[in-house]
Amino acid sequence: MNKFIVFEGIDGSGKTTQAKMLAEKLNAEYTCEPTTGKIGRTIREVLSGSECKKETLALLFAADRVEHVSEIEKMLQKSHVVTDRYVYSSIIYQTMQGISKEFIYSINFFAKIPDIVVILDVDTEEALKRMEFREKEIFEKIEFQKKIKQEYHKIAELKCSKFEPTYGFVMVNTTGKTPEEVFNELFNKILDKIPDII
């Protein structure tokens, strides 16, 4: 049976690189949030600095995810699916903006439960160095990223009962490691939990 794998972590932790490496290793479909669809493009405009109420942004993410989940279901019929960000990003980022978890849970009630979630950890300073040449988004300020990092630790340690992955969470620290070193570590951790994934 094909697996649904999610990558999470602060900006600059290496999610996109590692998600693509895993997709290639497993011959899986790679996807991401926000998506490249109409709603996803609107979200990217807001993240780049356009004005938007926090509740509207949360609803946009949920609406984009409705479309995304539909695509994920189709892709899972043919192969494993690896996504760069998912509902856990909404739980963390939107609650950090002052929106209640209950609101986030309610507007994401449809979200498909992943088989496993890989959380990539990294020193905040190293993450910011990695992002020096990227366009900055509204969520990329250092203090904010430190708080986000703490929230990811809470999700991994205390569990996220509403969207608990079938095989749980895996956390890998990427600080000072090459992409290959990170990949070997996370892939072995995934194999420990899901031996039949390959």
UniProtKB/Swiss-Prot annotation:
Alphabetically ordered keywords of this record: ATP-binding, Kinase, Nucleotide biosynthesis, Nucleotide-binding, Transferase
Residues engaged in binding ATP: 9-16
Catalyzed chemical reaction(s): dTMP + ATP = dTDP + ADP
Annotated GO biological process: dTDP biosynthetic process; dTTP biosynthetic process; dUDP biosynthetic process
GO cellular component terms attached to this protein's record: cytoplasm
MF GO annotations: ATP binding; dTMP kinase activity
Segment forming the signal sequence: none
Enzyme Commission designation: 2.7.4.9
Family: Belongs to the thymidylate kinase family.
Protein name per Swiss-Prot or TrEMBL: Probable thymidylate kinase
